[in-house]
Each structure stands twice: as C-alpha cells, then as structure tokens.
C-alpha cells in the first residue's frame, strides 16, 4: 500500500515536490479482483458466493484504483517496476505509469520480486538530498 499512498498523498496534498512510487499494489483493481491476487483473493471468494454485489464492489474499487488517481499528479513522478513481482504485477504498475500526465521516469528491474531494490533506494535517498 506504500506505493499507492505515495501517489494519493502527492496528488492531493499540494505539498510534495516529487512522487516516488515503488510497488503500488492498488493498480488495475478490477483485474486484481478477477485474478484474486494478493489481498483480493478473499474479495474474489466473497463475490463468488454473493455475485449480486459484484457491480457495487467494482464501482467502489474505482475510487481507490491508482490508475484513476495518477492523472491528478502535477509533479515529477518516479516509478520502480519489479518485473518478477507476483503481488504488484508489472503490467498493472506499468498501466498506472502510463496514465501519469506529468514529467515521469520509470526504473525497471528484471528478476526482482516484491520488494524495493537497493539500487532504487539509493536513487531515492540521493534525490531527497537534492530537494
């Protein structure tokens, strides 16, 4: 949730100078629900038992989907994309990145699972020292 929170805080606070996004799990929520990946496995099971709530659930999830919030970013944004992440699927993270309508950069890490690579941590720390 940290990656998603950085987007929300940066998009709506008006205080951020730059947004750093690593492992934003709240991308393409309708697809995550369909796949049942991560925390959405329980929600998928629930909707399988109670399909009459599916439309309401999908409508509500759109409010929390980072893909619908990144367009509010007006500051430079930096994404970390781990290609072997089974939780924050790379294609979903890239989709959020593609929706950013501000100066943006993406750091791609092949073979990296669900964690922030040390190299990206160093990059972010060096950037903070410049702000």
Predicted feature residues:
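Short alpha-helix in the alpha/beta-hydrolase fold that links the catalytic acid
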Residues: 75-77, 89-98
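Glycine-rich nucleophile elbow surrounding the catalytic serine of serine-hydrolase chemistry
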Residues: 1-9
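Hydrolase active-site cap/lid region
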Residues: 8-52, 108, 116
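Active-site nucleophile elbow and catalytic-triad environment of alpha/beta-hydrolase enzymes
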Residues: 53-69
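Acidic catalytic loop of the alpha/beta-hydrolase fold
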Residues: 83-88, 114-115
């Amino acid at each position: 949730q940290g990656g998603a929170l950085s987007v929300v805080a940066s998009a709506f606070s008006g205080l951020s100078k730059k947004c750093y996004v690593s492992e934003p799990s709240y991308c393409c929520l309708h697809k995550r629900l369909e796949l049942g990946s991560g925390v959405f496995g329980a929600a998928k099971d629930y909707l399988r038992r109670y399909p009459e709530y599916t439309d309401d659930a999908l409508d509500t999830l759109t409010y929390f989907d980072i893909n619908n919030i990144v367009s509010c970013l007006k500051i430079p944004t930096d994404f970390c994309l781990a290609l072997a992440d089974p939780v924050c699927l790379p294609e979903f993270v890239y989709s959020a990145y593609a929706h950013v309508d501000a100066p943006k950069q993406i750091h791609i890490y092949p073979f990296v699972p669900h964690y922030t690579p040390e190299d990206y941590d160093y990059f972010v720390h060096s950037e903070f020292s410049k702000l």
